[in-house]
Curated annotation (Swiss-Prot):
Phenotypic effect of disruption: Cells grow to slightly higher density than wild-type in sublethal levels of streptomycin.
Broad EC category: lyase
GO molecular function: fumarate hydratase activity
Family statement drawn from the similarity comment of this UniProt entry: Belongs to the FumD family.
Source species of the chain: Escherichia coli (strain K12)
Keyword Lyase carried by entry: yes
EC assignment: 4.2.1.2
Protein name per its UniProtKB record: Fumarase D
Domain of life: Bacteria
């Protein structure tokens, strides 16, 4: 992956995760408010049937923490 740092990879994954949620909410006709995005991510993270990489889990947790501050 070149010279990417772990922080850069985490940031990119956070952006991907948030973008995916916002687009899915738009498709469902919902307004993407920060608290709703955090809730969607919490629910997704709690679903143990879906395997996620450690990077994706860390990104989701970091986004949740940033949105509920």
């Amino acid at each position: 992956m070149g010279n990417r740092t772990k922080e850069d990879e985490l940031y990119r994954e956070m952006c991907r995760v948030v973008g995916k949620v916002v687009l899915e909410m738009r498709d469902l006709g919902q307004e993407p408010k920060h608290i709703v995005i955090a809730g969607v991510l919490r629910t997704a993270l709690a679903n143990k049937r879906i395997q996620r990489s450690e990077l994706e889990k860390q990104a989701m947790e970091t986004v949740i923490n940033a949105l509920v501050k």
